[in-house]
Curated annotation (Swiss-Prot):
Pfam families: Lactamase_B
Pathway(s) per entry: Secondary metabolite biosynthesis
Chain's role: Lactamase-like protein; part of the gene cluster that mediates the biosynthesis of dibenzodioxocinones such as pestalotiollide B, a novel class of inhibitors against cholesterol ester transfer protein (CEPT). The biosynthesis initiates from condensation of acetate and malonate units catalyzed by the non-reducing PKS pks8/GME11356. Pks8/GME11356 lacks a thioesterase (TE) domain, which is important to the cyclizing of the third ring of atrochrysone carboxylic acid, and the esterase GME11355 might play the role of TE and catalyzes the cyclization reaction of the C ring.
Protein name per the record: Lactamase-like protein GME11357
Stored PANTHER family: ATROCHRYSONE CARBOXYL ACP THIOESTERASE, ENDORIBONUCLEASE LACTB2
Broadest EC class assigned to this enzyme: hydrolase
Species annotation: Pestalotiopsis microspora
Cofactor: Zn(2+)
Length: 320
């Protein structure tokens, strides 16, 4: 997968359109390395693929069975694929494993969709489902909470941004981290709120974990490097937006004295990416990226917005 900055450069081509972007995603999916349905990827971790491959789930959701003894825990449950629960049941029965805890990284359906099938197959798990901001009949996970089974202890980190309830889990014995959807094995993740996820990435860095077990994609061997890359990409985009806003302020002539110059996201796309962008690509792809950045900068007090004729327009504050 290309980096976010490379994708942004690719999307700036005047020949790009929505179909081409979809084709790009499909091509990138085909280039992903295949992952086995079930694989022992460390002495303490077995990965079971969720059987839900797609443009945004990559090879499928990774679910992890953690521990070395008879009693183990599972992190995430896939999307509810019948093949996933069949693979999980076969694995547990063949290895004599009993699940003690079901830990969910966040609420999205491709991570929680298999909960009902797990409970149907193993009714004792009805009271063993754990998630931050839990649904009814689930148990809460709080920041710093630990879960232990034979051979493994995982410690929860509240890391919002991809989702408000997102949790990562540090596997203490391996100095590794289950990163959920905050960091993927390929490419970059979708963001609910940019400011919180950047703070979460910085917090994840302080754990100094060597290995990452992501919610989607292959094993991450240098986790801090991957996190640092993601942070740098977002900071670069912030700088592009700020440079563009400085540009419009610099163009303010004497006739605009005392009046504020502001622009809408569509105009900002042109300033950042140039003219000739397909309108659908601008609306569906580029504008949401820039709005995400603008909201973060507004929360930081660096930019502001005003409503003009029902339209939100953005401007730099004087400290920019």
């Amino acid at each position: 997968m290309k980096t976010e900055s490379e994708v942004g450069h690719h999307m700036a081509s005047s020949t790009l359109n929505v179909d081409a972007f979809r084709d790009y995603l499909e091509t990138q999916l085909k280039r992903l390395p295949p992952l086995p349905d079930v694989e022992q990827i460390s002495p303490r971790v077995i990965r079971v693929l969720g059987q839900n491959p797609g443009e945004f789930t990559l090879q499928g959701t990774n679910t992890y069975i953690v521990g070395t003894g008879r009693s183990r825990l599972i992190i995430d449950t896939g999307q509810g694929s019948p093949q996933w629960i069949e693979n999980v049941v076969f694995l547990l029965e063949s290895m004599g494993i009993i699940l003690s805890h079901v830990l969910l990284t966040h609420w999205h359906g491709d991570h929680t969709g298999g909960v009902a099938d797990l409970i149907k197959s193993y009714p004792h798990l009805t009271t063993a489902i754990y998630k931050n901001s839990p649904a009814r009949d689930q148990n809460n996970i709080i920041d710093g909470q630990s879960f232990s089974v034979e051979g493994a202890t995982v410690r929860a980190l509240h890391t919002p941004g991809h989702a408000h309830d997102h949790m990562c889990f540090v596997l203490v014995e391996e100095n590794a981290m289950f990163t959920g959807d905050n960091i993927l094995g390929h490419g970059t993740t979708a963001v609910e709120e940019l400011g919180p996820i950047m703070s979460s990435w910085r917090r994840m860095l302080t754990e100094n974990c060597e290995r990452g077990y992501p919610g989607h994609g292959q094993l991450i061997h240098n986790l801090n490097h991957k996190i640092t890359e993601q942070l740098a990409s977002k900071v670069r985009r912030e700088n592009l937006v700020l440079d563009a806003l400085r540009c419009i302020r610099g163009q303010q002539g004497p006739q605009m004295a005392g009046r504020r110059m502001s622009i809408n996201p569509k105009q900002l796309v042109i300033l950042v990416h140039g003219k000739g962008i397909n309108e659908n690509v601008s609306t569906l792809v580029l504008e949401p990226f820039l709005i995400e950045t603008l909201r973060k900068l507004a929360a930081d007090g660096i930019v502001g917005f005003e409503i003009c004729n029902g339209e939100k327009r953005w401007f730099p504050v004087q400290t920019v």
